[in-house]
Amino acid sequence: MSARRQELQDRAIVKIAAHLPDLIVYGDFSPERPSVKCFDGVLMFVDISGFTAMTEKFSTAMYMDRGAEQLVEILNYYISAIVEKVLIFGGDILKFAGDALLALWKVERKQLKNIITVVIKCSLEIHGLFEAKEAEEGLDIRVKIGLAAGHITMLVFGDETRNYFLVIGQAVDDVRLAQNMAQMNDVILSPNCWQLCDRSMIEIERIPDQRAVKVSFLKPPPTFNFDEFFTKCMGFMDYYPSGDHKNFLRLACMLESDPELELSLQKYVMEIILKQIDDKQLRGYLSELRPVTIVFVNLMFKEQDKVEVIGSAIQAACVHITSVLKVFRGQINKVFMFDKGCSFLCVFGFPGEKAPDEITHALESAVDIFDFCSQVHKIRTVSIGVASGIVFCGIVGHTVRHEYTVIGQKVNIAARMMMYYPGIVSCDSVTYDGSNLPAYFFKELPKKVMKGVADPGPVYQCLGLNEKVMFGMAYLICNRYEGYPLLGRVREIDYFMSTMKDFLMTNCSRVLMYEGLPGYGKSQVLMEIEYLASQHENHRAVAIALTKISFHQNFYTIQILMANVLGLDTCKHYKERQTNLQNRVKTLLDEKFHCLLNDIFHVQFPVSREMSRMSKIRKQKQLEALFMKILAQTVREERIIFIIDEAQFVDGTSWAFIEKLIRSMPIFIVMSLAPFSEVPCAAANAIMKNRNTTYITLGTMQPQEIRDKVCVDLSVSSIPRELDSYLVEGSCGIPYYCEELLKNLDHHRVLLFQQAETEQKTNVTWNNMFKHSVRPTDDMQLFTSISEGQKEVCYLVSGVRLNNLSPPASLKEISLVQLDSMSLSHQMLVRCAAIIGLTFTTELLFEILPCWNMKMMIKALATLVESNVFNCFRSSKDLQLALKQNVPTFEVHYRSLALKLKEGLTYGEEEELREMEGEVVECRILRFCRPIMQKTAYELWLKDQKKVLHLKCARFLEESAHRCNHCRNVDFIPYHHFIVDIRLNTLDMDTVKRMVTSQGFKIDEEEAIFSKSELPRKYKFPENLSITEIREKILHFFDNVILKMKSSPNDIIPLESCQCKELLQIVILPLAQHFVALEENNKALYYFLELASAYLILGDNYNAYMYLGEGERLLKSLTNEDSWSQTFEYATFYSLKAEVCFNMGQMVLAKKMLRKALKLLNRMFPCNLLTLTFQMHVEKNRLSHFMNQHTQEGSVPGKKLAQLYLQASCFSLLWRIYSLNFFFHYKYYGHLAAMMEMNTSLETQNDFQIIKAYLDFSLYHHLAGYQGVWFKYEILVMEQLLNLPLKGEAIEIMAYTADTLGHIKFLMGHLDLAIELGSRAHRMWSLLRNPNKYQMVLCRLSKPLFLKSRYKHLVQVLGWLWDLSVTEEDIFSKAFFYFVCLDIMLYSGFIYRTFEECLEFIHHNEDNRILKFQSGLLLGLYSCIAVWYARLQEWDNFNKFSDRAKHLVTRRTPTVLYYEGISRYMEGQVLHLQKQIEEQAENAQDSGVEILKALETLVAQNTTGPVFYPRLYHLMAYVCILMGDGHSCDFFLNTALELSETHGNLLEKCWLSMSKEWWYSASELTGDQWLQTVLSLPSWDKIVSGKGGQRKRSWSWFCPPNFSMVSWSQPQCA
């Protein structure tokens, strides 16, 4: 039975019949139009309140997950219940009108009495339904019902393509009046219905002053059997299902295929519905919350009661309305009788029908319809209401009876305006603003209180769309604000200034054309140009703005320009204009021809006989000749600059005149125009190709300029980074997009504004750690203050998810226009791509496209790339590069393009498309040009359809969701997949098997080698070797490894470089988002944690923080709290949070997180000395046991390994944190943490992990000062390495070891050995093709080379570092490069890259998220700049950069970069102290003591590393000499010299020697010593070529004040 029912439902005729009443389906109508049919029946009008409010609530919802589908479910939940009741009781649903419906019981007149009883019973049961249901979505849904009975007439009308029907007559008027009288839950009977019903069965309540009555309840006699009565009544209904069909709600569900009937019924159904039925798409596909324009037309007739009269009038009106709407892709949605009139509900912008300039077309259509219908003599009054906005467009009703309808406040507003403002075309403010028509086309109407509309806003009358010469009203539309800068358009203004200069110098015509899409800010550019042009003396700028209507008015542009030139724009009366004209043309034109100006300038010169005989063409020529003379006369007196906005609307005659004008006299014309929609006329083409024309295509604003714009628009000094990213990405650099996105955020109250606080006052927590805001450029600060000295900052409301926000209606409309202009296949491709995300690969798109082959897809993609829907990229590096820079403004050389032969153009286009196809084949990554398009297309899918496609995407991506092949496809969080069951439960077995083989669900053979070995270690270092011999042996070992890597690369060296960074963006992040969409929160959490871990590995703390935020939201949604996998995810989450906190220098938070993680991993870390002592004893015994163990146990299970690796990671961070603290007992905690890391790593039985632990343990003992212990563990590392096979991961272990040992040796001051090891590590990592590691080793190698003054080698390393930073687009390596360049300038006496270049890099990148949230590097850069300015004694600049550095000082991390940065910062503070002492500042001594304490603290810290001691002692010596403490100065200076000698630190030793010489000699330095030195610093190239002389090192960077040490005394400081 169900199969049969499904077969019936799939029939096209059944689907069509579901949109129509039985009255039409089974009707027999004559082919004449109009045709009339009369019958008797009962009408029920049901009005449902609450739907409009619900539609508004959904249409203004913030997030994309609250869309049309949810709304249609709620609407149909109620409406289908009503429809079902009506059908069960034998009714026929005639029409759905938004949130109301009209039902009919068609019977003979003698049956009316009984049928009314049935209908009343049905009405009461409908009310009962709603009383039982709870309010949905917080809205109270209630119904009002009106009933009428009597004589009904049906009118069928239309044209050859579409038919419509109406029911008219007294009963129809009565039923509407009855419903209007009803209150909530009332049933009202019309007077006639009350007359015809069985009064004995009905209890009523009288309505005062009305003949209609209200039904209270039915009161059947005790013996009354309603079922028998109902069955009897249904026998009189022609199409009530009975017998074999009694289980069907409607007989129309059983219709057999009948092509003739189907063709007939199709005429009653909208075209988009028929398309949906033909495409066999799911019901509901057309349900959307969609921006549309509603045109409500109401016709009132002179003889309302005569069907034949109104029938012909409606027919005439309908045919005309249909023809007008067809031109502009509008459609009639409903036609019904409405309060004594006939109403047409017309809609522009239905799915698939969206067109540009929709609002203008709607108004144009409305005016046309109004003009036509007003001429139909049988129509008394025509009233039209036009409203624009988001409404619900969708199929509403029951599966067996439904209609496509529109619901929303805008529908109501259009309907109310139509009734409250009769006899005119009225529109709302949104339509008025969106039309972009001149204000003089409209007149504001007085406000009226309209039923059901709380605040419609201003209402306007549309006066007509024929352009009139409104002198003084065609100025540029936008305003120029003195306090608002023109942002991001420097280049465009430069083009104007340059062209202007040429115009003035050559006295030759110039044309400057700015082409740009709507929203690019063309009008703003012209407004600025008008202002600049008017600043020059003897220059006259005439600026006008055209509209869409201007194009259709002959000679309109010249007419307006000449009116301005002649000064007519300021005249208040035609007589004044006439006098002005007479004075200007009397010498140029015979008086008898003055009347030539009558029409064009609205004057009244007497018409001469000669003029009346003149032909139209001759008049035009005379007029043009006169204008030429006037202009020739004017340009002799002053320079004329014509400025024309929206020049695409210049009419053809005006173009021809302009073309002639620029050839005849020197004139400067500036135009802005949107790209021509059609081929421009010959004259326009000629101007574009003229040698004196400069044609500029406007680019978008750059990210920094968008940031500036937002800060200026909001009047704030900073905005959140998340908001900045959202607006930069969402706007694509288009000013209008940015403004609309901001308005949308403001509308949803997402933005908060507060007084700016200093950063020192803010307590750092996890939630505010990354709330460092982005600021506008310095020159914008002036425009961002709310008042003098007061600044506000912008924040986001807590919990808001910007990326999930639904796009603003205005921007959605732009995307819908573009989508609807595409073919259906292209639309499908774009919608499928939208499911994948903003960025996607061709492989994944092909996977989810239904029934496409690769050739079809490539061809479609090429077209869409050409149409600027997608951008394509060969690699993720290209993508990242493109995202950093928006398309800039550029000049188009149409003259050279025009040289191509016309015959070749078509061929060229085809060739271009073929080239694009080839490019798409090569490019595997694509991205939506506009994120708004992706969001808009995504919202068009149904929930179930989305789920199917998200699942397809997830299954495809899972196979690659791990590290790249280069990194052996492992997890970013070691052994993560062993803990969390993320794949197997949802995938088929073939996929599972494939994934097992590709991803290593079991440990592969190579991993097994490193994880366990049954054989005892073969190699041991002989005990009698000296340190030198061991050193040579180690270096020789690494040399051998490098030799073997070079000699057999195929076995050892990976074929491709690391691709992990790319995989994060195109695989793992999209996969996490697909799982979020599928509500698979545990899987989504897994991948967000993987992402966070990966970004921490890549040094991107901000992204790690953001994805941990996503993870935290998902963790809160998980319910199975007792599962081990969830516990592990919590532990991972806390450990990753700890790592972020550690990197940001928030050690207290980091420690707290690590303790939480270890507790969840069942490794509680002691929190008091008693448990510490006990745990220390346990761990020492464990370590002894592991170290003395000769054979290893069986392999460790994957789950256990995951746990151990995470524990080891936590302990590694913990000992570093404890090492930072001075408290004596903290070193024991640090020692315990280091030992626990060691034991945990040994338990893994993995060589790589064990070697890492040995190296960590060695470093810990180095820094803690345990001289003998560290050596033992370094030997153990080498013994471990010597026992590994030379392949795969073992090579990486060896490279890692060389690199880490080199780093440790550098920290400890063994600079020669650090260089030896670093050089070998560099060669190994370069062969292993891992950019991240290669970058790190180059950075590390540069520092010992710098301190050893080995500049030739250093410059070579810097060259490699620069090449890497450019190739990989790596900001960290580029920043480090400039840091070393600054060091070279400050300390080495030559220039490798200029100071200006370094400073520019900092200015452009200081807000980069990797640098901003990386501890040390930005601190170092700021501090170096501050030191430079301090030496130049430019103290304002010094303070600026020193203050920036100061904010970063608090991020204390035990890293080399931090100590490099802090030592530069301290140097700046010491130089500032010198200034204070010279100026005898009051707090100088306090500052000196504070600086000395800070330096002593740095030296005392375990984590600092001896390599920094010489510099720190040097600074301490200088502070002492400044403060008059010669004894301490000697001590610190000598200590620093000894350490420099020991380390081989030639650079510091040289500086110390010079300081000693200067401080203890009688020599004096001049104040501008450093300035003189700066000016004579040689470049590296000059030094190499021998032209630069010696490097400048004959000066000291510390120039003590000009007074002897003995003169310093305590009172002076006070």
Curated annotation (Swiss-Prot):
One of its GO terms (cellular component) is cilium. Gene3D superfamilies: Nucleotide cyclase, P-loop containing nucleotide triphosphate hydrolases. ATP binds at D47, I48, S49, G50, F51, T52, D99, K144, V406, N412, I413, A414, A415, R416. Its main location: membrane. Binds 2 magnesium ions per subunit. Is also active with manganese (in vitro). Its EC number is 4.6.1.1. It comes from the Eukaryota. It catalyses: ATP = 3',5'-cyclic AMP + diphosphate. Mg(2+) 1 binds at D47, D99. Belongs to the adenylyl cyclase class-4/guanylyl cyclase family. Catalyzes the formation of the signaling molecule cAMP. May function as sensor that mediates responses to changes in cellular bicarbonate and CO(2) levels. Has a critical role in mammalian spermatogenesis by producing the cAMP which regulates cAMP-responsive nuclear factors indispensable for sperm maturation in the epididymis. Induces capacitation, the maturational process that sperm undergo prior to fertilization. Involved in ciliary beat regulation. This is Adenylate cyclase type 10. It comes from Mus musculus. The gene is Adcy10.
